[in-house]
């Protein structure tokens, strides 16, 4: 339900402790042996793959395909149930991959889902957009470079759970306490979900038109269809969570009133301030932050009106993306779907090695060259290029002067140092999207109103338990 919440004052709650506790699912059968202990010797890794390029660049539907149930279970059988499961070690959520892979192989989808949801509140999200640290730490990655398709298996389990009706609203026993969650991105939704199931009455405040945060307005639909978010939000609303959208705490509503009206407040507003590129010509028309393009496109697909003069259209344009990460890749895919004349992506750092990197050996997450579905659709990729200035004509962007740089070892053994080479060139561009990462939360509004202390990176200062100086915030 999305509505206003009544006022209630009370005492601070042990919220941190509540977030740590999750119900344990007991298997009907102890898993001591995998169903097919030699499958990894005879069965090769098979990915679902992407839809054909010529088809997918004409729409914003999800690009990743799915395997049939038989093939998916066969892929799950490749898990070796290692004595030391490095997949579990690598997963930030602590997922129990060997357990639910075995259950998937045996066709016990309901049990597999219950094991999965112990550690992952929203596997339908992570099963689509997680970078799959677990797969990079799989022993089969080390031995034959064919890790188990863990991420895809995870997505298959949760989709089967929704399809078969295993995912149902839970009506918890209320404890009489109220909690406000500020922000409805992945962190905010997780906090809301866990506390609601512990009996707290949870209200989520979201500044945008719909819940989801970065999931909704940052990640393109071709990676995460928004019907997936809507499906989960409906479940959460049926469980009693209130969503107040178009409500920016610190602007539309005073932060001090939220603190006063709830027993506890969880701040989950994300690091939304992007890294800027303050060089000559930054003011020119055609220079945008990456999220300006991505959030606008997602709003258009949601049917949210965008003033014509504010719309960014890459059709027939020469597009330059500055920044080589996932956000930059998302800009590439979006520009291609607009019908850009050409798309170039540049990165100031050196090109990562292909395949393996001695600096990040197994089971660490490898710093190697990654080629996304967006790159496959058409993109010129270049490295070791620094941007010197934006070039304009009649206040419109027409190009960017870039300079080749070198990275040399630091004399003190620290990070490599950048050295300019003097080799300059101009890359023609009608549109530039800055995708150089994010810095910290927005300081205006909630942080300033409550005078919250921040650290030297402008993040909210908290103690080891995650609390601010305010005992219930």
Regions found by a protein language model. Give the residues of each.
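Intrinsically disordered, glycine-rich low-complexity segments
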Residues: 2-3, 21-22
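Low-complexity, intrinsically disordered or signal/transmembrane-proximal segments
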Residues: 9, 25-29
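Short phosphate-coordinating micro-motif centered on Lys-Gly-acidic
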Residues: 72
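Beta1-alpha1 glycine-rich phosphate/pyrophosphate-binding loop at the start
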Residues: 38-65, 94-106, 111-120, 147-151, ...
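FAD-site-proximal beta/loop scaffold in flavoenzymes
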Residues: 283-316, 409-473
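Beta1/beta-strand and adjacent pyrophosphate-binding region of the FAD-binding site
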Residues: 174-184, 315-322
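Feature captures the FAD/FMN-dependent oxidoreductase FAD-binding
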Residues: 173, 178-182, 230-279, 388-409, ...
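Glycine/serine-rich phosphate-binding loop and adjoining beta1-alpha1 elements at the start
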Residues: 77, 89, 95-172, 237, ...
């Amino acid at each position: 339900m999305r509505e206003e919440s009544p006022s209630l004052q009370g005492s601070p709650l042990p919220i941190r402790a509540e977030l740590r506790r999750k119900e344990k699912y007991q298997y009907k059968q102890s898993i001591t042996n995998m169903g097919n202990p030699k499958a990894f010797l005879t069965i090769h890794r098979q990915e679902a793959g992407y839809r054909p390029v010529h088809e997918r660049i004409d729409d914003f539907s999800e690009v990743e395909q799915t395997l049939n149930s038989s093939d998916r279970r066969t892929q799950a059988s490749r898990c070796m149930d290692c004595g030391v499961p490095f997949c579990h070690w690598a997963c930030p959520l602590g997922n129990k991959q060997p357990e639910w892979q075995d259950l998937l192989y045996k066709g016990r989808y309901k049990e597999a889902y219950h094991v999965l949801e112990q550690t992952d509140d929203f596997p339908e999200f992570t099963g689509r957009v997680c970078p799959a640290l677990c797969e990079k730490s799989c022993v089969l990655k080390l031995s034959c470079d064919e890790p188990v398709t863990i991420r895809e298996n995870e997505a298959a389990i949760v989709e089967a759970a929704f399809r078969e009706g295993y995912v149902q609203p839970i009506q918890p026993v209320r404890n009489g306490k109220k909690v406000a969650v500020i922000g409805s991105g992945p962190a905010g939704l997780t906090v809301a979900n866990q506390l609601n199931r512990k009996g707290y009455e949870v209200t989520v405040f979201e500044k945008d038109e719909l819940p989801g945060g970065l999931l909704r307005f940052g990640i393109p639909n071709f990676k995460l269809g928004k019907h997936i978010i809507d499906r989960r939000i409906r479940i959460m609303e049926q469980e009693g969570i209130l969503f107040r959208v178009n409500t920016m705490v610190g602007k539309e509503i005073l932060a001090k009133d939220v603190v006063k009206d709830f027993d506890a407040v969880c701040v989950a507003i994300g690091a939304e301030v992007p890294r800027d590129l303050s060089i000559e010509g930054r003011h020119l028309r055609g220079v945008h932050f990456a999220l300006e393009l991505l959030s606008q496109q997602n709003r258009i697909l949601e049917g949210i009106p965008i003033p014509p003069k504010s719309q960014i259209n890459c059709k027939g344009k020469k597009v330059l993306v500055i920044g080589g990460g996932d956000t930059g890749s998302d800009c590439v895919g979006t520009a291609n779907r607009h019908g850009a004349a050409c798309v170039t992506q540049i990165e100031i750092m050196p090109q990562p090695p292909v395949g393996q990197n001695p600096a990040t050996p197994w089971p660490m997450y490898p710093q190697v060259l990654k080629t996304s579905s967006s790159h496959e659709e058409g993109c010129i990729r270049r490295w070791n290029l620094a941007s010197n200035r934006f070039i304009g004509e009649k206040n419109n962007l027409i190009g960017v002067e870039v300079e080749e740089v070198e990275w040399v070892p630091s004399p003190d053994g620290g990070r490599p140092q950048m050295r300019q080479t003097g080799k300059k060139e101009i890359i023609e561009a009608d549109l530039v999207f800055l995708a150089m990462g994010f810095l910290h939360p927005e300081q205006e509004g909630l942080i300033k109103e409550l005078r919250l202390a921040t650290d030297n990176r402008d993040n909210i200062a908290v103690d080891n338990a995650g609390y601010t100086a305010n005992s219930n915030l």
